[in-house]
């Protein structure tokens, strides 16, 4: 593994962004959405950056980069079209032991930013380790079509009730079974309809069942008997250690 994957909490943390063009704009959008305090060093601002500056959403430090600017920031992103300037920022970050990402220049990065599928609290990061960014973006597009938008709603409701479920079901296996069953129930349908009240009622109903970890046996047809034809549902039952019988 060439890079260590992680998700960073940037809420109220200062970060430095070098550049104020279109590429830097996309970086700034994601940083702001994560709650970061974005400091921008650039000679000029494009209209979007200017609007953010006028609204107090970013701090514009002007166009002169000084190494001391790195002292108080969490990390720096170099997103200009000036390769010499980007290298200068990276080398300064190395001296100050600060993480630096230089857009589209893997050898000037101490960290990389993955392609992300964003479904609210649920986020999936895809990275090629800087070797093939277009391939990572391609797979992001594919995965985005597989994960419905209401997955984020499901995750938010689950997060709200997680502690209650933990208090009610003190066994890890019970809790895992409960969540697996819930996410396959009408709970997902209600979440897709943005009917939060109905989704929570479904959660409460299942949680209040007298035997939430009751027994279950599954009978599955396996066609010609090829194990590669086992359905996803059967594989999930195996993970939950539910006895399964196949008909050949």
Residue ranges and their predicted role:
Residues 3-48, 52, 67, 214-248:
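Glycine-rich, flexible N-terminal cofactor/catalytic loop recognition
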Residues 35, 39, 73-83, 122-130:
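Short beta-strand and adjoining strand-loop segment in the mid-core
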Residues 38, 60, 99-100, 245:
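Hydrophobic beta-strand scaffold residues
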Residues 42, 60-64, 104:
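Short loop/edge segments at beta-strand edges and connector loops
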Residues 53-71:
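Glycine-rich, highly charged phosphate/nucleotide-binding loops
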Residues 75-81, 86-113:
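ADP-ribose/adenylate-binding Rossmann-like module
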Residues 100-152:
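E1/E1-like adenylate-forming module used to activate ubiquitin-like modifiers
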Residues 130-211:
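An accessory alpha-helical subdomain
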């Amino acid at each position: 593994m060439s890079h260590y994957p992680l998700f960073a909490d940037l809420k109220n943390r200062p970060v430095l962004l070098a550049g104020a063009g279109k590429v830097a704009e996309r970086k700034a959008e994601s940083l702001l959405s994560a709650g970061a305090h974005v400091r921008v060093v650039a000679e000029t601002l494009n209209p979007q950056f200017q609007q953010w500056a006028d609204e107090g959403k970013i701090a514009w430090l002007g166009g002169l980069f000084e190494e001391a600017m790195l002292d108080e920031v969490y990390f720096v992103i170099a997103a200009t079209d000036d390769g010499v300037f980007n290298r200068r920022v990276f080398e300064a970050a190395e001296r100050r032991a600060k993480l630096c990402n230089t857009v589209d220049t893997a050898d000037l990065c101490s960290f990389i930013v993955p392609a992300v599928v964003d479904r609210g609290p649920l986020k999936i990061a895809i990275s090629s380790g800087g070797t093939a960014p277009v391939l990572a973006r391609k797979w992001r597009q594919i995965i985005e079509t597989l994960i419905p938008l209401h997955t984020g709603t499901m995750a938010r409701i689950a997060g709200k009730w997680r502690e209650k479920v933990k208090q009610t079901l003190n066994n890890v296996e019970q809790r895992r079974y409960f969540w697996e069953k819930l996410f396959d129930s009408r709970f997902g349908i209600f979440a897709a309809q943005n009917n939060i009240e109905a989704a929570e009622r479904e959660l409460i109903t299942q949680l209040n069942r007298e035997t939430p970890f009751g027994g279950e046996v599954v009978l599955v047809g396996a066609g010609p008997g090829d194990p590669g034809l086992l359905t996803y549902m059967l594989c999930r039952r195996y993970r939950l250690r539910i006895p399964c019988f196949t008909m050949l």
